[in-house]
Amino acid sequence: MFVDQVKIYVKGGDGGNGMVAYRREKYVPKGGPAGGDGGKGADVVFIVEEGLRTLMDFRYQRHFKADRGQHGMSKGQHGRKSEDLLVKVPPGTVVKDEKTGQILADLVTHGQTAVIAKGGRGGRGNSRFATATNPAPEIAENGEPGQERDVILELKVLADVGLVGFPSVGKSTLLSVVSSARPKIAEYHFTTIVPNLGVVETGDNRSFVMADLPGLIEGAHAGVGLGHQFLRHIERTRVIVHVIDMSGLEGRDPYEDYVTINNELKEYNLRLTERPQVVVANKMDMPDAEENLQAFKEKVGDEVKIFPISAVTKQGVRDLLFEVANLIETTPEFPIHEVIDESDTSVMYKFETEGVKFDITRESDGTFVISGYDIEKTFKMTDFSRDESVRRFARQMRGMGIDEALRARGAKDGDIVKILEYEFEFID
């Protein structure tokens, strides 16, 4: 098992803008305001897809931006809410906020969903602001900005394919050739003492996880050598790739190796022999390999399909990967015969705005900079092209206590105040 990790950017859709409009119909004097509200922006929703096994797809698309809501219209018509953006993830994906490290979701079962970036609400149209003293307001809100964040996806990956075979037959070399994994490679027994895993992608954009498992020797089912550790990992795989050294340089007979490994898999008695097995004749670039392969074929018979390859020269590797990918698609998952802790450790996470309404700092040129979730959200939802909206924004700032706080920090008439990229003069 290893942890695959990728960083992506998600943004919920902005809400649609409210509209300033008036009812203008014949025989209807003083029709009044008729601007509709904007629609809600779409959420970015992660959903578990049981057919996915890796995070490979996120290597190519790392930005996910949901659609904004439709703007409000005249005649009191509200904008349409946008459809949520569904992002498929494999089972076992943990989503963390990159900035805070907070776990946003732990996605386990097929169809499970989690809202990772909420869409903004639609801005209100001018019909919402009508009062007895202002029956025809020329004011409307912009849509609320959608939530945006960088998130880290982590996936504890189990291997789809297990490489088995005696030590030093070339399993680590094969894994390094077909994936980005970089296992230790050396010509001595038990080079691999813990499983190395790599994500393999075929030429037709299919992907799977391949494990170079610890070398297996006779007696592994009884715990000899690294036996139990090896067999626990292979128990989780769906396809077994049996790598055999056809060069004979180690002084072993390829057929005897083949029989010994299969006997060990059978003795472990966890349906390992029911898994499809691909026999790989490796090191075919060596001098005596072809002769040894012919002798091996005579002993195993025609019913065993053999893929001659050279992991070093990559000869035959492409056809091997296509065969393995086809077998994975047609082979069901096998049950795991071990105790699994099923205690309920689920946690509900709730999106909350920041507790502090605003913060005031002063730059070297004397400019007062106001920041904070509430004031920045209010600023973005204000339509500054309309005088009435600007006056409303000034009232909202006073209501938040910003004017009073600026005076306490020494602000005087004519001083520059900045919110985001917008600058204005302070008037006492």
From Swiss-Prot:
EC nos: 3.6.5.-
Residues reported in the UniProt entry to bind GTP: 165-172, 190-194, 212-215, 282-285, 310-312
CDD domains: Obg
Domain OCT: 350-428
Disulfide bonds, paired cysteine numbers: none
Keyword set, alphabetical order: Cytoplasm, GTP-binding, Hydrolase, Magnesium, Metal-binding, Nucleotide-binding
Domain of life: Bacteria
Key word Manganese present: no
GO biological process, one term: ribosome biogenesis
GO (cellular component) term, any one: cytoplasm
InterPro entries: G_OBG (IPR031167), GTP-bd (IPR006073), GTP-bd_Obg/CgtA (IPR014100), GTP-bd_prot_GTP1/OBG_C_sf (IPR036346), GTP1-OBG_CS (IPR006074), GTP1_OBG_dom (IPR006169), GTP1_OBG_dom_sf (IPR036726), OBG_GTPase (IPR045086)
Binding site for Mg(2+): 172, 192
Residue stretches making up the Obg domain: 1-158
Job description of the protein: An essential GTPase which binds GTP, GDP and possibly (p)ppGpp with moderate affinity, with high nucleotide exchange rates and a fairly low GTP hydrolysis rate. Plays a role in control of the cell cycle, stress response, ribosome biogenesis and in those bacteria that undergo differentiation, in morphogenesis control.
Subunit structure: Monomer.
Family: Belongs to the TRAFAC class OBG-HflX-like GTPase superfamily. OBG GTPase family.
Listed name of the protein: GTPase Obg
Organism of derivation: Bacillus cereus (strain AH820)
UniProt gene name: obg
